[in-house]
Amino acid sequence: MSPLARTPRKTSVLDTVEHAATTPDQPQPYGELGLKDDEYRRIRQILGRRPTDTELAMYSVMWSEHCSYKSSKVHLRYFGETTSDEMRAAMLAGIGENAGVVDIGDGWAVTFKVESHNHPSYVEPYQGAATGVGGIVRDIMAMGARPVAVMDQLRFGAADAPDTRRVLDGVVRGIGGYGNSLGLPNIGGETVFDPCYAGNPLVNALCVGVLRQEDLHLAFASGAGNKIILFGARTGLDGIGGVSVLASDTFDAEGSRKKLPSVQVGDPFMEKVLIECCLELYAGGLVIGIQDLGGAGLSCATSELASAGDGGMTIQLDSVPLRAKEMTPAEVLCSESQERMCAVVSPKNVDAFLAVCRKWEVLATVIGEVTDGDRLQITWHGETVVDVPPRTVAHEGPVYQRPVARPDTQDALNADRSAKLSRPVTGDELRATLLALLGSPHLCSRAFITEQYDRYVRGNTVLAEHADGGMLRIDQSTGRGIAVSTDASGRYTLLDPYAGAQLALAEAYRNVAVTGATPVAVTNCLNFGSPEDPGVMWQFTQAVRGLADGCADLGIPVTGGNVSFYNQTGSAAILPTPVVGVLGVIDDVRRRIPTGLGAEPGETLMLLGDTRDEFDGSVWAQVTADHLGGLPPVVDLAREKLLAAVLSSASRDGLVSAAHDLSEGGLAQAIVESALAGETGCRIVLPEGADPFVLLFSESAGRVLVAVPRTEESRFRGMCEARGLPAVRIGVVDQGSDAVEVQGLFAVSLAELRATSEAVLPRYFG
C-alpha cells in the first residue's frame, strides 16, 4: 500500500485550511508519510497551524530525499563553487532546471540529463524502467527541445542469481518498449552484473534533446492572470508516492511485495503525441513556462512553477481530469501518473493552446492561474485545502549535514592488493585468460540486450553499438553532430571514491574523444546507499568532490544531475556508483572515428598512453579470483585532455581510421572488440621487454588503441611526439586473416571469439 493511501479517503469533514486552524491537536500520520518529528514541527511553524491532510501529503513528498535532496544539497553546492565563468560560458541552463542546456554553435543547443528509476524497477521491472525513460524524456521536452536519443546505465545482481532474470527481462523490455514506441534511438550505455545489486538494481536513463537557442523554455510561473493548463493523460491512483517516497527508503526483508502500488504505469504512445503537441505549442509561442509532471506530480509542478516565478498561484484541484473515482485531494495532488505536463499560458493564447491540444487529441484543462500574491492556494470544490508559501515546499525544505566518517574497513580494503594473485605467463595461459574474460558476464557481448532496442530510427544515428560513444547528426546541411557516453565503476569507487568518480569521468570523456568529438559538458547520476550511514556519506562526499574537481581540471561544466540514495537492503549497500555522462560536439559527423578495424588496407595499430601494472579492482581480478581490494588505477586528467586534443586533430586531418578506448579488460579486450566490429584479423607484436600479461590486461587509464592508415603513420607519430603523448606501434591489421594473433604467444580465430562472447547472455537469460 502506498503511504499516501493511508491518509483518510472519506471523512465526514473535508480537512480544509479553516478546519485545520480550529483543530490543532488532531493526530496526523506524518511518520508514515516519511516525515521526521522535527520536520513536522517545522511545517507547523511555517504555517502557524497544523497542516491539512492535503498539505501534509504535499510537504511529505516534496521534502522526501528524492525530491528535496536534503542529505546531498549541502555537498552538491561544490559543483557550483568549482565552476569557473569560462566553464559557464556555453551553458544556457544549468543545475536547478529540468535539464542542462549547452550552446553547441550555429544557433543550436543541446539538452541532456540522466536520472534514476532504481527502486521502481525492482518492484515492477517493466513499468519501472519504461516510466524511467518516459520521465527523463519529459524533462528534455520541458526545456523546449525535441528528444532525439536515449541511453541507459544498468546494474543487476549476479547473472546466475535467481531473481536477476526477472529483473533484467522486465527492465530491458521496458526500456525497449517505451523508447522504441517513441521512435528514439538507443545509442549506448552499460550493463554490469555484481552481487551487490541483487535486490537493488540500478536503472539510470539518459535522454538527449536538440533545440534552436531561441526555443529554450524554463520552468517558472510569471505574470498575474496567466493561466495554468494541465495537459496530457488523465490523473489516476498509479504511482502515488512512487519515486518520491519509494525512492527515499530502503527495501526490507519483504522486498518488493508491499510496494507494488507505488510504481507508475506508462503509455509511450500518449507521450509520443505529447512530444509533437509540445513542439507545436513552442513553435506557436503559446507557452510562457512549463514543467513536466514526474516525481510528486502536481505537488511538484505547481510549487516549483510558483516558487521560480514572481507571484503566487491558485489551483482548482477538482478541475483535474481523473481516471479513478473518489480520489482525495491529496491523491490528486501527489499522483505520479505519467505523460502529463503543466504550462503557464497568457489568457489571450488559451484558446489557441487548447486548439493545438485538440488537434493532437491531447486532453487539456485550465486548472488555475498566476496571482500577484506570494501563496500557493489550492481549492477542492470551492474549499481551500492548501495555503502555503510555495518556496517552503519546493526549494526551502530541510537541509541535513549528515555525519561523515571514513569506514573502519577502508584501510584493510586498500591493503588487500591483487599482486598476491597468480598471473598467467605462458601463451596458453594468456589465451585462456582472454577467453575467460570474454566469456564472462562482465565482458561478453551485450547484443542480446541491445538488439531489443532500435538504434537507428530517424536515420540520424552515426555511431551506436560497438562504438565507445553514441553519435548523432543534428544538422543535415552542415553535418554538425553530437557524441554522448555514460560510464561508471562501482568497484573502483569502493576502493577510492574520489578517484573512482574521476575515473568514471575520464572514461566517459575519453569515450567521446575517440569518436573525434570534443567533450563540452557533463551530467551525472549519483547512486549510493543510505545517507544515514556515515560511511556511505563519506563515499558520497568524496565522489562529489572528485567529480567536481575533475570537471574543473578538464574545463567542462556539470550541467545537472540526480542523486539516488537508499540503494540498499537492510545494512547491505550497493557499491557506490556515480554514473557520469559526457556530451561532445563534432562539426561534421563525416569525420567521425569508428571502432572497427579494416577501414583502410594494412592499417598500423598503435597504443596511446602509458601502461602500468594496475590490476586492483580489475575485471581480471574479479573473474579469476573474485577479488576486490587495493587501489584503483592512477587518473591523469591532463593526459586525458591531451588525448582528446590529439584525437580531434587526427580526426580532422584524416590520420586515424579507427579508435577504441582501453578500460575493462585492457588492451586485449579493446583489440578483440575492434577486430570483431571490423570483422577483420590483426597481428599484435608486443614491444621488446614488455610483460605480456601487463600490456594485454592492465586497466591503466588514459589509453587508446588507434588504427592509422599506413601512409599516415609517420605523420601521426610526429604529431604525438610533438605533443608529448606516448605512442607505441603494437601491430598491424591483416584483412586477409580471420584471427587475432599475439605473435609468439597465441592466436584465436574471430569465429571462436565471437561465439565465446555472444553465447553468454542467451545462456543466462535466453
Curated annotation (Swiss-Prot):
This is Phosphoribosylformylglycinamidine synthase subunit PurL. Mg(2+) 2 binds at residues 139, 292. Pathway: Purine metabolism; IMP biosynthesis via de novo pathway; 5-amino-1-(5-phospho-D-ribosyl)imidazole from N(2)-formyl-N(1)-(5-phospho-D-ribosyl)glycinamide: step 1/2. It is an enzyme of class 6 (ligase). Belongs to the FGAMS family. It is found in: Cytoplasm. One of its GO terms (biological process) is 'de novo' IMP biosynthetic process. Its main location: cytoplasm. GO terms for cellular component: cytoplasm. The active site is at residues 66, 117. The keyword Metal-binding applies. It catalyses: N(2)-formyl-N(1)-(5-phospho-beta-D-ribosyl)glycinamide + L-glutamine + ATP + H2O = 2-formamido-N(1)-(5-O-phospho-beta-D-ribosyl)acetamidine + L-glutamate + ADP + phosphate + H(+). Part of the phosphoribosylformylglycinamidine synthase complex involved in the purines biosynthetic pathway. Catalyzes the ATP-dependent conversion of formylglycinamide ribonucleotide (FGAR) and glutamine to yield formylglycinamidine ribonucleotide (FGAM) and glutamate. The FGAM synthase complex is composed of three subunits. PurQ produces an ammonia molecule by converting glutamine to glutamate. PurL transfers the ammonia molecule to FGAR to form FGAM in an ATP-dependent manner. CDD domains: PurL_repeat1 (cd02203), PurL_repeat2 (cd02204). The keyword Disulfide bond does not apply. GO terms for molecular function: ATP binding; magnesium ion binding; phosphoribosylformylglycinamidine synthase activity. Substrate binds at residues 116-119, 138, 264, 336-338, 564. Its EC number is 6.3.5.3. Gene3D superfamilies: PurM-like C-terminal domain, PurM-like, N-terminal domain. Mg(2+) 1 binds at residues 115, 562. Coiled coil: none annotated. ATP binds at residues 69, 113, 524, 561.
